[in-house]
């Protein structure tokens, strides 16, 4: 049986931890409100942008002069997976779920005879893939020390991806991230980046009350696409970063809430054990005193 001093120290330690987890829950809740608002504001723009690029890709499928960023380079040998994770832990299964999903996709592609390359966004994804897929990583990014994610951050990542594509390091690029559904739910999701998915327009417009429509391009296709294609990559990456940020805070708030409640239950059990031990010690001392008095 543990001593009273050990139990008191244990109770004090758990109470201290409970204060920390409660504070982290409150901080995550405050950050979640802003992150959720940003993610929800960016989502329609990214969705319509993807739909437009999908429509353009479908229309340009037979055009031999169509930009490679739009329709691909005609090859399907090397796949780049851009994995978006968090820079910090203590968020339940948030990071593990997207990392495992990306690893499963990589292994599936390899089983099909494809080559896989990785671009990790976030320290948790970087550390995860450095352990067993270090040689496949061609780029890394994180936001350590930054309070907010800016569009310029997404543009920088997009520029690195475009440069790698132009250098022939991959043929197909897919973005993987945790899509924010609710505080309790963050779902690993995929978005095609290169080439633009021709089926994306129909899929996105199926859930939209706005018609797809025909696009009139001015002054000409080349001028517009030269600017629009890199921006589309940046928009999709930026939206994924915001979705992931909101999901991270939701997962952390849930994890810290569970930790706080578990700490409370542990404190109750330890306190009960402490009281029982103290009562047993007092009873033992009384018996010894009474036995000593009877002996006299």
From Swiss-Prot:
Spell out the Pfam families in the cross-references. Answer: ATP-synt
Could you name the Gene Ontology cellular component terms for this entry?
plasma membrane; proton-transporting ATP synthase complex
Instruction: Name the keywords, alphabetized.
Output: ATP synthesis, Cell inner membrane, Cell membrane, CF(1), Hydrogen ion transport, Ion transport, Membrane, Transport
Q: What is this protein called?
A: ATP synthase gamma chain
According to its UniProt entry, this protein's organism is Acidiphilium cryptum (strain JF-5)
Q: What's the gene? A: atpG
Intracellular or extracellular location(s):
Cell inner membrane
MF terms from GO for this chain are: ATP binding; proton-transporting ATP synthase activity, rotational mechanism
Q: Which InterPro entries match?
A: ATP_synth_F1_ATPase_gsu (IPR035968), ATP_synth_F1_gsu (IPR000131), ATP_synth_F1_gsu_CS (IPR023632)
